[in-house]
Regions:
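Gly/Ser-enriched beta-turn/beta-hairpin loop segments
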Residues: 45, 69-70
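Short loop/turn microsegments at loop-to-beta-strand junctions
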Residues: 6, 49-50, 103-105
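Active-site-proximal beta-strand/loop segments in catalytic clefts of secreted hydrolases
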Residues: 64-66
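Residues that flank catalytic or metal-binding motifs in active/ligand-binding sites
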Residues: 3, 48-50, 74
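Core segments of cupin and vicinal oxygen chelate
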Residues: 9-58
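Vicinal oxygen chelate
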Residues: 11, 15, 25, 56-60, ...
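Acidic/histidine-enriched, glycine/proline-rich intrinsically disordered or flexible terminal extensions
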Residues: 134-159
Length: 159
């Protein structure tokens, strides 16, 4: 990987599977080099996939198969800005329908425990509205949503 700054994500032996799923799901994503362990190590054997270089929505990452010691938490998430409800729905359901779990305010967790914010640009723009009362209504509407519904955001923005 030639990027100066790369996000390292810890997996329990499933880095390649996760990277392949992300590459198939998110635009501007791909799997790069796969490195196999040259010798046995505490959480694996010689020849096991040790690291996987991949890109998620243009962000360079490396998946490290380090074992079950450090699970993912909400302290780290990918925020994916979507252009419309169809894209929001597609990405949300790709994550949820393949073993993930929904959460609040557009957040969800994939089957590997990694957290995602599937966030329509319409929500981002509405929350930044110079009309702070409208932004408050949008915020309150968002707080009641699981997956973000743009129609609900727009209705709250209008009042």
């Amino acid at each position: 990987m030639t990027a100066k700054n790369t996000i390292c994500l810890w997996f329990d032996g499933t880095a390649l599977e996760a990277a392949q799923f992300y590459a198939a799901t998110f635009p501007d994503s791909a799997v790069g080099a796969v490195f196999h362990a040259p010798a046995d190590y505490p959480m694996g054997k010689q020849g096991d996939v040790l690291t996987v270089e991949f890109t998620v929505a243009g962000i360079p990452c490396i998946g490290l198969n380090g074992g079950p010691i450090f699970p993912h938490t909400e302290a780290f998430s990918f925020q994916i800005a979507t252009d419309d409800q169809a894209e929001t729905d597609r990405l949300w359901h790709a994550l949820i329908d393949h073993g993930g779990q929904p959460s609040a305010c557009g957040w969800c967790r994939d089957k590997w425990g990694l957290n995602w914010q599937i966030t329509p640009r319409a929500l981002i723009d509405a929350l930044a509205s110079p009309d702070r009362e409208a932004a408050r209504r949008v915020f309150e509407a968002m707080m009641g949503m699981t997956k973000i519904e743009i129609a609900g955001v727009e209705a709250a923005l209008r009042g």
